[in-house]
Amino acid sequence: MARSPFSPHWHSVAALKPRLMAYAVIRRMVFRGKPWYSVQDQAGGKVYRFSLAAYELIAAMDGHTTVHSLWERANSTASRDACTQPEVVDLLMQLHGANLLQTDSPPDSAASLEKQRKKRWETPRQWLLNPMSLKIPLLNPDAFLTRYADYLSWCFGPIGMLLWLVVVMPAAFLAVQNWDVLTHNLSDQVFSSSNLLVMMLVYPIVKLLHELGHGVATKHWGGAVRELGLMFLIFAPVPYVEVSSSSAIVSKYRRAVVAAAGMLTEIFLAALALYVWLLVEPGVARAVAFNVMVISGVSTLVVNGNPLLRYDGYYILADLIEIPNLAQRGQAWWTYLLDRYGFGAHEAVRPDETTAESRWLTAYTPLAWCYRTFVTLGMIFLIANQYFVIGVVLALSLIHI
């Protein structure tokens, strides 16, 4: 069923004279030969993506022209499909919700206070709704990363690549040669009570370096890193950095490097840890090195590096195949397929995907679901084999995540 080009709410926005905030920056990007435009909030670092039709409206917002005039002008001059009134209303709401829009109307004090109140209670509300996955912002690392990003810029050139290969490649051969020793009775080694204490101390440090890798790469290509904090996944502290501004980087290969920077950092750490593990006698240093290898190796191969899970590998794949929001679009595509062909809903609206995109979406979503289920159940059974109660708690908690 086609959507009406007219909106019952048009009267509330038609007379507004909007313009973008001064800290909003527009960039042109190309995905699969089709132009898109990103609007980056330089104050907060977030990036929003819009179609060509939406961009033509946004670019014409000068603070003097009414929304109705902008819409009429777009419909009278556009050779392509212009935005409908409901789409314009949605666009204005999205820009307003992101604090990117300024209008000629005086601010509503009550509405502003209500918005601040909702924002203040947003984090506690998320904690109450999902106590197994808490996110606590701690500080703004942008100034720190800006100060040191220039000193580390060589890491993203030939010298950095050569150093990484010189350290990692020999370590890979040594790992193969010592594989039996490294993996002997692995689960008992990892889940022993003494090793778990060491792992709890090592894990946050390794993951902090992982996240700083993303942050330095983002700063190297002109992005902003406005937030560093702790995310408690099933009560385990995991550092994170907010690098959504990297999605405004025009080159898809540079965006992919930003997504891969954390894994490259961990692999480098794992290689150094292997050398330490081979050189020192059994003791604290060897235990720490072993845990660095386990954390970096397992997380890279099984979790972060796999595009079927929504971690680093996922963003690398989405950037390289030029399908942003791959998971969400895959879910929308499969919802359409099930509605249209499974339940015979002939009025189901087909998502606006090309033939090549629909092939990726058709394959990706079921593969991701199967792999995610396999990894989740495998981890639960592995932990439950050593600590039954913890395994049960993990299984129950995943129902809520």
Q: What is each of the regions a protein language model found here?
A:
Residues M1-I26:
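Eukaryotic partner-binding/assembly regions in large regulatory complexes
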Residues A2-H9, R32-W36, Q42-C155:
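Long, charge-rich, low-complexity alpha-helical segments
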Residues T103-W164, A224, M231-F232, G313, ...:
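Membrane-interface and transmembrane segments of multi-pass membrane proteins
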Residues E122-L228, L272-W277, G283-R286, V294:
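Core alpha-helical transmembrane segments of integral membrane proteins
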Residues P158-L165, V258-I267, W360-R372:
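Select subsegments of transmembrane alpha-helices in polytopic membrane proteins
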Residues F191-E357:
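Membrane-embedded catalytic scaffold of the fatty acid hydroxylase/desaturase
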Residues A271-R286, C370-V392:
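Transmembrane helix-loop junctions at the membrane interface of multipass transporters and ion channels
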Residues I399-I401:
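Conserved small/polar residues in nucleotide/adenosyl-binding loops
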